[in-house]
């Protein structure tokens, strides 16, 4: 059995969970998330917690045990607190701004790159070089942050580009001159 899957998911008072077969709906103060879980796992709601158990002893069932528990836990945390990813833009002349809902990034190309957020995602820009992506679905927040980073990934020589705030860029030495 999965060590992660063994621990039950605690449900706060403000959150309601509806289990309908393999579809789990979580409603909370920040919104509602709905997800279809993979087969091979059973869900039981007891008072203010959800217990996830593998339905069989087969490998595919045991593989999905911890995954489903973590997905439910992420949904509960998303509707209560939400998720956010912070990115930094490094480089002369590189900046970002929000126009309406779209994020406009000037990252050294001949044109600014515009990104429209999917439903439930918001962009926030502080001081032209710090971008915060926030929402209730951890997966979508991470994907949107990765898309923004892929506009201009950080390069190892000068460190220019878009990077996560806590990301360390391993620097390389430049070419040495003729000797």
From Swiss-Prot:
GO terms for biological process: cytoplasmic translation. Keywords: Ribonucleoprotein, Ribosomal protein, RNA-binding, rRNA-binding. GO terms for molecular function: rRNA binding; structural constituent of ribosome. It holds the Pfam family Ribosomal_L6. PROSITE patterns: RIBOSOMAL_L6_1 (PS00525). Gene3D superfamilies: Ribosomal protein L6, alpha-beta domain (3.90.930.12). One of its GO terms (cellular component) is cytosolic large ribosomal subunit. This protein binds to the 23S rRNA, and is important in its secondary structure. It is located near the subunit interface in the base of the L7/L12 stalk, and near the tRNA binding site of the peptidyltransferase center. Part of the 50S ribosomal subunit. Belongs to the universal ribosomal protein uL6 family. This is Large ribosomal subunit protein uL6. It comes from Prochlorococcus marinus (strain MIT 9515).
């Amino acid at each position: 059995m999965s060590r992660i899957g063994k621990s039950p998911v605690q449900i706060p008072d403000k959150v309601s969970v509806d289990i309908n077969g393999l579809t789990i709906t979580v409603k909370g103060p920040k919104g509602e998330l709905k997800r279809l879980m993979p087969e091979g796992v059973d869900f039981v709601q007891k008072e203010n917690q959800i217990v996830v158990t593998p339905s069989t002893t087969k490998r595919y069932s045991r593989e999905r045990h911890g995954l489903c528990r973590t997905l439910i836990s992420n949904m509960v945390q998303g509707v209560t607190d939400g998720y956010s990813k912070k990115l930094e833009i490094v480089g002369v002349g590189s900046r970002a701004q929000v126009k309406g809902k779209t994020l406009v990034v000037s990252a050294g190309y001949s044109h600014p790159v515009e990104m429209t957020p999917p439903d439930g995602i918001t962009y926030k820009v502080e001081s032209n070089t710090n971008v915060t992506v926030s929402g209730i679905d951890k997966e979508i927040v991470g994907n949107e942050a990765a898309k923004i980073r892929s506009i201009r990934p950080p390069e190892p020589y000068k460190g220019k580009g878009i990077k996560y705030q806590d990301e360390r860029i391993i620097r390389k030495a430049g070419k040495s001159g003729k000797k």
